[in-house]
Amino acid sequence: QSNTLFRINPYSGYEMGSLDVRHALASSPVYLAFLSKMTGLHSLIMAHIPYGIVLIVIYYCMIYSAGHTLFDDEKDSKYISVFACMACVFTICGNISSSVPQTFMLMRTWQGKAVLANICIPAAFLYLIMAAKTVKEDKIPLGIYVMLGIAGLSATAMTTSGAVFIPALAVGGMLVISIVRKEYWAILK
């Protein structure tokens, strides 16, 4: 252990001359190291136990929010719990391969790709669904734009592919919503 961040190449053991772009954007390892230093826990223990538990709780809160958004009518509100339970069963029983999102969420929670696939992308879709439900209103509420931005920033902090994927998803979704609204400048309102 060298007590430094991104100064030594983990593959060769030599000091790095400059920080590569891949690690410059994804700051989740730095945050994990900060939490480890502040709590006194080893970074491996921090990543596997407290950090993983918090991310799994956020994941299940995201599932409940998706159910609440999809079944927002009074008559459909009883299906929110059914949706959340079914999603939890699919998550628990979805461990059929090492590369499916369910395995990423429960077995490799601390990795940035798991957070991107299970929290950031569903959050972006959730906020796009919320924006699509405002078709009858004059304009999309500012809070939806803010939450889409937060989903994009958190995806960027987790993995560098999130820096491209979530903004592209948000722009594509807003483009579809503006076409449905027949207001081609609705994104800027």
Where in this protein do the model-derived segments appear?
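Active-site lumenal/periplasmic loops and adjacent helix-entry segments of GT-C-fold
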Residues: 1-90, 94, 99-110, 115, ...
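Hydrophobic alpha-helical transmembrane segments
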Residues: 46, 81-85, 145-150, 187-188
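Hydrophobic core segments of transmembrane alpha-helices in multi-pass, intramembrane catalytic enzymes
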Residues: 56, 117-124, 166-170
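Membrane-interfacial entry segments at the cytosolic side of transmembrane helices
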Residues: 75-77, 140-143, 182-188
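Specific aromatic-rich, kink-prone transmembrane helix
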Residues: 110-135
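Membrane-interface alpha helices of multi-pass inner-membrane proteins
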Residues: 144-160
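Perimembrane helix-loop-helix junctions
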Residues: 166-188
